[in-house]
């Protein structure tokens, strides 16, 4: 209700825990709860390398907002399962933190990204991907990702791939603004 009163009429929640996103969307759609239109994912799909949490992500299973996938067959299985349980979007964490390396690296290969996209698209569900690196933007756009989140460090090749393949970008400037404003304070705590 607060979001509606603030003028927000629609939003996307890319990944949720415990089926909260689809349950809230369904409650809003049924009129049981006042709120904006919601398009939601279930858990984000991560490889065992992890997302932004690196070694904090387990090698398998579900943790919070993340479902760990390690093979192409698991990717297809979990995309289908997420759609079965109400996902409007499938979210991939295409990049992740790798100990000893700076920045985030592409942690999915082309075949894995393509398998996720093909499976979701066959069931009329779009795919978004967390991409914090030039290579991830390019590869995800080329393999069928519909919405590139962040697009950090995107280069000309990545931009061309986005345009050529009809992908969209959600740059999430809030993250970068907060990093610029508060990054030095966070680094003192960590």
Where in the sequence are the language-model features?
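Alpha-helical scaffold segments that flank or form the walls of functional sites
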Residues: 1-34, 66-88, 118
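Active-site neighborhood of phospho(di)ester-bond hydrolases with catalytic His/Asp-centered motifs
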Residues: 4-5, 12-15, 39-41, 128-129, ...
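Residues that line or immediately flank small-molecule/substrate-binding pockets and catalytic motifs
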Residues: 15-18, 42, 94, 152
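Metal-cofactor-binding active-site regions of metalloenzymes
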Residues: 4-9, 32-67
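Active-site core of metal-dependent hydrolases
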Residues: 48, 93-190
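Active-site gating/metal-coordination segments in enzymes
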Residues: 55-114
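Short, well-ordered coil/turn segments that N-cap beta-strands
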Residues: 8-10, 32-37, 87-88, 121-125, ...
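Short, solvent-exposed turn/loop segments enriched in Gly/Ser/Thr/Pro and often Arg
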Residues: 14-21, 44-45, 173-175
């Amino acid at each position: 209700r607060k979001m509606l009163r603030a003028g927000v009429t629609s939003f996307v929640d890319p990944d949720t825990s415990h089926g909260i996103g689809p349950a809230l969307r369904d409650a809003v759609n049924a009129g049981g709860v006042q709120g904006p239109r919601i398009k939601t994912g279930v858990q984000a799909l991560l490889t065992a390398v992890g997302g932004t949490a690196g070694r904090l992500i387990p090698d398998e299973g579900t943790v919070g907002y993340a479902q760990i996938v390690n093979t192409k067959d698991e990717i297809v299985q979990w995309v289908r399962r997420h759609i079965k349980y109400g996902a409007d979007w499938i979210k991939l964490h295409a990049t992740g933190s790798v100990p000893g390396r700076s920045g985030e690296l592409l942690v999915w290969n082309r075949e894995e990204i393509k398998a996720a996209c093909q499976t979701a698209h066959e069931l009329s569900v779009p795919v978004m991907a967390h991409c914090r690196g030039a290579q991830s933007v390019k590869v995800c756009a080329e393999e069928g990702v519909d919405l590139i989140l962040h697009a950090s460090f995107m280069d000309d090749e990545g931009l061309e791939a986005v345009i050529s393949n009809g992908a969209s970008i959600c740059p999430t400037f809030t993250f970068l603004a907060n990093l610029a404003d508060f990054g030095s304070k966070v680094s003192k705590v960590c």
